[in-house]
Protein backbone atom coordinates (compact mmCIF):
# COMPACT_ATOMS: atom_id res chain seq x y z
CA UNK A 1 0.00 0.00 0.00
CA UNK A 2 1.23 3.47 -0.85
CA UNK A 3 1.00 5.19 2.53
CA UNK A 4 0.27 8.69 3.78
CA UNK A 5 3.12 10.71 5.26
CA UNK A 6 3.65 13.16 8.09
CA UNK A 7 6.76 14.32 9.96
CA UNK A 8 8.30 12.43 12.90
CA UNK A 9 8.90 15.36 15.26
CA UNK A 10 7.95 19.01 15.45
CA UNK A 11 10.26 21.65 14.01
CA UNK A 12 10.31 25.44 14.20
CA UNK A 13 11.38 28.46 12.18
CA UNK A 14 11.41 32.21 12.75
CA UNK A 15 11.43 34.85 10.03
CA UNK A 16 9.63 37.84 8.56
CA UNK A 17 6.74 38.02 6.14
CA UNK A 18 7.63 39.11 2.60
CA UNK A 19 4.73 41.53 2.32
CA UNK A 20 3.91 42.36 5.95
CA UNK A 21 7.49 42.63 7.22
CA UNK A 22 6.21 41.15 10.51
CA UNK A 23 8.26 38.76 12.64
CA UNK A 24 6.58 35.37 12.66
CA UNK A 25 7.19 32.04 14.38
CA UNK A 26 6.27 28.83 12.62
CA UNK A 27 5.86 25.44 14.30
CA UNK A 28 5.36 22.37 12.12
CA UNK A 29 3.82 19.40 13.94
CA UNK A 30 2.95 15.80 13.03
CA UNK A 31 -0.71 15.04 12.33
CA UNK A 32 -2.79 11.87 12.30
CA UNK A 33 -3.79 10.13 9.04
CA UNK A 34 -6.49 11.88 7.01
CA UNK A 35 -5.97 15.16 8.88
CA UNK A 36 -4.64 16.92 5.81
CA UNK A 37 -2.57 20.07 6.14
CA UNK A 38 -3.99 22.54 8.64
CA UNK A 39 -2.74 26.05 9.37
CA UNK A 40 -3.49 27.31 12.89
CA UNK A 41 -3.38 31.00 13.85
CA UNK A 42 -2.17 30.61 17.43
CA UNK A 43 -1.69 34.37 17.95
CA UNK A 44 -5.43 35.05 18.08
CA UNK A 45 -7.44 35.14 21.35
CA UNK A 46 -9.05 31.89 20.22
CA UNK A 47 -6.82 29.86 17.84
CA UNK A 48 -8.39 29.36 14.41
CA UNK A 49 -7.76 26.31 12.22
CA UNK A 50 -7.59 26.80 8.45
CA UNK A 51 -7.53 23.45 6.62
CA UNK A 52 -6.18 23.70 3.09
CA UNK A 53 -8.72 23.35 0.29
CA UNK A 54 -9.05 25.04 -3.08
CA UNK A 55 -12.02 27.00 -1.75
CA UNK A 56 -10.09 28.16 1.32
CA UNK A 57 -8.12 30.49 -0.96
CA UNK A 58 -9.54 33.97 -0.36
CA UNK A 59 -6.97 36.23 -2.04
CA UNK A 60 -4.42 35.76 -4.82
CA UNK A 61 -2.88 39.23 -5.14
CA UNK A 62 0.92 38.77 -5.17
CA UNK A 63 0.59 35.50 -3.18
CA UNK A 64 -1.87 32.79 -2.19
CA UNK A 65 -3.89 33.61 0.93
CA UNK A 66 -6.15 31.14 2.73
CA UNK A 67 -8.79 31.96 5.30
CA UNK A 68 -11.49 30.59 7.60
CA UNK A 69 -13.49 31.91 10.52
CA UNK A 70 -12.35 35.47 9.92
CA UNK A 71 -8.64 34.52 10.11
CA UNK A 72 -6.20 34.52 7.21
CA UNK A 73 -2.71 33.30 6.39
CA UNK A 74 -0.87 34.97 3.51
CA UNK A 75 1.90 33.68 1.25
CA UNK A 76 1.42 29.97 1.86
CA UNK A 77 2.67 28.80 -1.55
CA UNK A 78 6.38 28.21 -0.78
CA UNK A 79 5.68 26.08 2.30
CA UNK A 80 2.92 24.23 0.44
CA UNK A 81 5.32 23.61 -2.43
CA UNK A 82 7.80 22.01 -0.03
CA UNK A 83 5.01 19.78 1.32
CA UNK A 84 4.08 18.79 -2.22
CA UNK A 85 7.68 18.12 -3.20
CA UNK A 86 8.23 15.89 -0.16
CA UNK A 87 4.86 14.15 -0.48
CA UNK A 88 3.55 15.14 2.95
CA UNK A 89 -0.16 14.51 3.49
CA UNK A 90 -0.75 15.44 7.13
CA UNK A 91 0.70 18.38 9.03
CA UNK A 92 -0.24 21.03 11.57
CA UNK A 93 1.29 24.44 10.93
CA UNK A 94 1.08 26.77 13.94
CA UNK A 95 1.74 30.39 13.01
CA UNK A 96 1.99 33.51 15.19
CA UNK A 97 1.13 36.12 12.53
CA UNK A 98 -0.86 36.45 9.34
CA UNK A 99 1.93 35.63 6.89
CA UNK A 100 4.28 32.66 6.41
CA UNK A 101 7.93 33.80 6.74
CA UNK A 102 9.67 34.31 3.42
CA UNK A 103 13.05 32.98 4.71
CA UNK A 104 15.36 33.01 1.66
CA UNK A 105 12.59 33.49 -0.92
CA UNK A 106 12.53 29.85 -2.03
CA UNK A 107 11.23 26.66 -0.44
CA UNK A 108 14.70 25.30 0.37
CA UNK A 109 14.57 26.26 4.06
CA UNK A 110 11.18 24.59 4.44
CA UNK A 111 12.51 21.45 2.76
CA UNK A 112 15.46 21.44 5.18
CA UNK A 113 13.16 21.88 8.19
CA UNK A 114 10.81 19.11 7.11
CA UNK A 115 13.57 16.68 6.18
CA UNK A 116 15.32 17.41 9.49
CA UNK A 117 12.11 16.52 11.32
CA UNK A 118 12.02 13.23 9.42
CA UNK A 119 9.29 11.76 7.25
CA UNK A 120 7.05 9.12 8.82
CA UNK A 121 4.90 6.65 6.91
CA UNK A 122 1.38 6.21 8.28
CA UNK A 123 -0.97 3.26 8.26
CA UNK A 124 -3.46 4.76 5.83
CA UNK A 125 -3.62 4.80 2.02
CA UNK A 126 -2.35 7.90 0.26
CA UNK A 127 -5.22 9.46 -1.69
CA UNK A 128 -4.67 11.18 -5.02
CA UNK A 129 -6.83 13.29 -7.28
CA UNK A 130 -6.40 11.75 -10.72
CA UNK A 131 -7.25 14.00 -13.65
CA UNK A 132 -9.34 12.08 -16.20
CA UNK A 133 -9.67 14.64 -18.99
CA UNK A 134 -8.11 17.97 -19.94
CA UNK A 135 -9.21 21.05 -18.00
CA UNK A 136 -8.10 24.54 -19.00
CA UNK A 137 -8.62 28.15 -18.03
CA UNK A 138 -7.68 31.10 -20.25
CA UNK A 139 -7.67 34.86 -19.96
CA UNK A 140 -6.99 37.66 -22.42
CA UNK A 141 -5.94 37.57 -26.07
CA UNK A 142 -2.85 38.39 -28.08
CA UNK A 143 -0.04 39.77 -25.93
CA UNK A 144 -2.34 39.66 -22.89
CA UNK A 145 -3.05 35.93 -23.24
CA UNK A 146 -2.42 33.68 -20.26
CA UNK A 147 -3.58 30.14 -19.62
CA UNK A 148 -3.16 27.07 -17.41
CA UNK A 149 -4.06 23.46 -18.14
CA UNK A 150 -4.27 20.05 -16.46
CA UNK A 151 -4.17 16.86 -18.52
CA UNK A 152 -4.23 13.15 -17.63
CA UNK A 153 -0.82 11.74 -16.67
CA UNK A 154 0.28 8.80 -14.52
CA UNK A 155 2.46 10.94 -12.29
CA UNK A 156 2.93 14.65 -11.77
CA UNK A 157 4.83 16.91 -14.13
CA UNK A 158 4.85 20.62 -14.83
CA UNK A 159 5.91 22.93 -17.65
CA UNK A 160 5.85 26.69 -17.22
CA UNK A 161 6.53 29.38 -19.84
CA UNK A 162 7.03 32.99 -18.77
CA UNK A 163 7.23 36.11 -20.91
CA UNK A 164 9.39 38.85 -19.41
CA UNK A 165 11.07 41.32 -21.76
CA UNK A 166 14.20 41.65 -19.64
CA UNK A 167 17.83 40.87 -20.54
CA UNK A 168 18.45 38.78 -17.41
CA UNK A 169 15.41 36.60 -18.04
CA UNK A 170 16.09 36.27 -21.77
CA UNK A 171 19.66 35.14 -21.10
CA UNK A 172 18.66 32.31 -18.75
CA UNK A 173 15.53 30.96 -20.44
CA UNK A 174 11.82 31.66 -20.32
CA UNK A 175 10.63 28.09 -19.72
CA UNK A 176 11.21 25.19 -17.35
CA UNK A 177 9.96 21.65 -16.88
CA UNK A 178 9.92 19.30 -13.91
CA UNK A 179 8.69 15.72 -13.56
CA UNK A 180 8.38 14.46 -9.98
CA UNK A 181 9.15 10.94 -11.18
CA UNK A 182 12.37 11.85 -12.97
CA UNK A 183 13.79 14.84 -11.11
CA UNK A 184 14.56 15.69 -7.51
CA UNK A 185 12.47 18.49 -6.01
CA UNK A 186 15.04 19.46 -3.38
CA UNK A 187 17.80 19.67 -5.97
CA UNK A 188 15.98 20.93 -9.06
CA UNK A 189 13.23 23.29 -7.83
CA UNK A 190 13.38 24.10 -4.11
CA UNK A 191 16.22 26.67 -4.27
CA UNK A 192 14.57 28.85 -6.95
CA UNK A 193 13.78 32.25 -5.43
CA UNK A 194 10.96 34.69 -5.90
CA UNK A 195 11.91 37.69 -8.03
CA UNK A 196 10.99 41.30 -8.61
CA UNK A 197 12.00 44.59 -10.15
CA UNK A 198 13.30 47.68 -8.38
CA UNK A 199 10.85 49.84 -10.34
CA UNK A 200 7.95 47.96 -8.73
CA UNK A 201 9.20 48.05 -5.14
CA UNK A 202 8.13 51.62 -4.33
CA UNK A 203 4.65 51.00 -5.73
CA UNK A 204 4.29 47.76 -3.77
CA UNK A 205 5.49 49.30 -0.52
CA UNK A 206 3.10 52.23 -0.90
CA UNK A 207 0.35 49.59 -1.04
CA UNK A 208 1.65 47.89 2.11
CA UNK A 209 3.32 45.03 0.22
CA UNK A 210 6.93 43.77 -0.07
CA UNK A 211 7.76 45.36 3.30
CA UNK A 212 9.98 42.41 4.20
CA UNK A 213 11.57 41.93 0.78
CA UNK A 214 15.21 42.49 -0.10
CA UNK A 215 18.31 41.02 -1.72
CA UNK A 216 18.56 38.32 0.94
CA UNK A 217 15.16 36.80 0.10
CA UNK A 218 14.50 37.59 -3.57
CA UNK A 219 16.14 38.00 -6.95
CA UNK A 220 16.05 41.75 -7.55
CA UNK A 221 16.54 43.30 -11.00
CA UNK A 222 16.89 46.81 -12.34
CA UNK A 223 16.14 47.48 -16.02
CA UNK A 224 19.20 45.59 -17.20
CA UNK A 225 20.59 43.05 -14.77
CA UNK A 226 20.29 40.99 -11.60
CA UNK A 227 21.46 43.03 -8.59
CA UNK A 228 22.18 40.11 -6.24
CA UNK A 229 25.93 39.79 -5.73
CA UNK A 230 25.81 35.99 -5.90
CA UNK A 231 23.81 35.94 -9.15
CA UNK A 232 21.41 33.12 -9.97
CA UNK A 233 21.21 29.64 -8.46
CA UNK A 234 19.90 27.88 -11.59
CA UNK A 235 19.58 28.27 -15.30
CA UNK A 236 16.01 29.50 -15.82
CA UNK A 237 15.67 30.23 -12.09
CA UNK A 238 12.78 32.58 -12.86
CA UNK A 239 10.73 29.90 -14.64
CA UNK A 240 11.74 27.30 -12.04
CA UNK A 241 10.36 29.55 -9.32
CA UNK A 242 7.08 29.70 -11.22
CA UNK A 243 7.02 25.89 -11.11
CA UNK A 244 7.75 26.06 -7.36
CA UNK A 245 4.81 28.45 -6.92
CA UNK A 246 2.52 26.34 -9.09
CA UNK A 247 3.30 23.20 -7.08
CA UNK A 248 2.33 25.06 -3.91
CA UNK A 249 -0.80 26.58 -5.41
CA UNK A 250 -1.97 23.24 -6.80
CA UNK A 251 -1.32 21.41 -3.52
CA UNK A 252 -3.97 23.64 -1.96
CA UNK A 253 -6.49 21.26 -3.53
CA UNK A 254 -5.79 19.12 -0.46
CA UNK A 255 -4.38 16.00 -2.13
CA UNK A 256 -1.56 15.28 -4.57
CA UNK A 257 -2.57 15.52 -8.21
CA UNK A 258 -1.91 12.91 -10.86
CA UNK A 259 -1.73 15.19 -13.86
CA UNK A 260 0.40 17.08 -16.33
CA UNK A 261 0.26 20.81 -15.65
CA UNK A 262 1.27 23.35 -18.26
CA UNK A 263 0.95 27.11 -18.15
CA UNK A 264 1.79 30.31 -19.96
CA UNK A 265 2.06 33.49 -17.87
CA UNK A 266 -0.15 32.00 -15.18
CA UNK A 267 -0.07 33.09 -11.56
CA UNK A 268 -1.68 32.43 -8.19
CA UNK A 269 -5.15 33.56 -9.31
CA UNK A 270 -5.21 31.44 -12.45
CA UNK A 271 -3.78 28.40 -10.66
CA UNK A 272 -6.60 28.56 -8.12
CA UNK A 273 -9.16 29.14 -10.86
CA UNK A 274 -7.83 26.01 -12.57
CA UNK A 275 -8.37 23.96 -9.40
CA UNK A 276 -11.90 25.26 -9.01
CA UNK A 277 -12.64 24.51 -12.66
CA UNK A 278 -11.37 20.95 -12.18
CA UNK A 279 -13.42 20.33 -9.03
CA UNK A 280 -16.56 21.80 -10.63
CA UNK A 281 -16.61 18.99 -13.20
CA UNK A 282 -16.93 15.64 -11.44
CA UNK A 283 -16.34 13.76 -14.69
CA UNK A 284 -12.86 15.31 -14.91
CA UNK A 285 -11.34 13.72 -11.81
CA UNK A 286 -11.49 10.84 -9.34
CA UNK A 287 -9.96 9.86 -6.01
CA UNK A 288 -7.57 6.90 -6.26
CA UNK A 289 -5.28 4.91 -3.97
CA UNK A 290 -2.62 2.29 -4.75
CA UNK A 291 -2.64 -0.99 -2.84
CA UNK A 292 0.32 -2.18 -4.91
CA UNK A 293 3.23 0.26 -4.80
CA UNK A 294 4.55 -1.13 -8.09
CA UNK A 295 1.47 0.30 -9.80
CA UNK A 296 1.93 3.71 -8.21
CA UNK A 297 3.37 6.56 -10.28
CA UNK A 298 7.08 7.28 -10.08
CA UNK A 299 8.02 10.02 -7.66
CA UNK A 300 5.57 9.10 -4.91
CA UNK A 301 6.94 5.80 -3.61
CA UNK A 302 10.23 6.96 -2.07
CA UNK A 303 10.98 9.97 0.17
CA UNK A 304 12.71 12.81 -1.65
CA UNK A 305 16.47 12.74 -1.29
CA UNK A 306 18.33 15.69 0.18
CA UNK A 307 20.40 17.98 -2.02
Swiss-Prot record:
GO terms for cellular component: membrane. It is an enzyme of class 3 (hydrolase). SUPFAM superfamilies: Ribosomal protein S5 domain 2-like. Disulfide bonds: none annotated. Zn(2+) binds at residues 78, 241, 245. Its cofactor is Zn(2+). It catalyses: a UDP-3-O-[(3R)-3-hydroxyacyl]-N-acetyl-alpha-D-glucosamine + H2O = a UDP-3-O-[(3R)-3-hydroxyacyl]-alpha-D-glucosamine + acetate. The active site is at 268 (proton donor). GO terms for biological process: lipid A biosynthetic process. The keyword Hydrolase applies. Pfam families: LpxC (PF03331). The keyword Metal-binding applies. One of its GO terms (molecular function) is UDP-3-O-acyl-N-acetylglucosamine deacetylase activity. Catalyzes the hydrolysis of UDP-3-O-myristoyl-N-acetylglucosamine to form UDP-3-O-myristoylglucosamine and acetate, the committed step in lipid A biosynthesis. Belongs to the LpxC family. This is UDP-3-O-acyl-N-acetylglucosamine deacetylase. It comes from Acidovorax ebreus (strain TPSY). The lineage of its organism: Bacteria, Pseudomonadati, Pseudomonadota, Betaproteobacteria, Burkholderiales. The gene is lpxC.
Amino acid sequence: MLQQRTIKTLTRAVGVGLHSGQRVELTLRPAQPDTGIVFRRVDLPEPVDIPITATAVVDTRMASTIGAGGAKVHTVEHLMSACAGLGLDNLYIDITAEEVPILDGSSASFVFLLQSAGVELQNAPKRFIRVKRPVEVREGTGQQLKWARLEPYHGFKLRFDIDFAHPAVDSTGQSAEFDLGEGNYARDIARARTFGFTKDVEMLRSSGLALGGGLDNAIVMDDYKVLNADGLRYDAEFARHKILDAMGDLYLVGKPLLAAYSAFRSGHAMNNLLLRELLAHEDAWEIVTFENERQAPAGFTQPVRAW
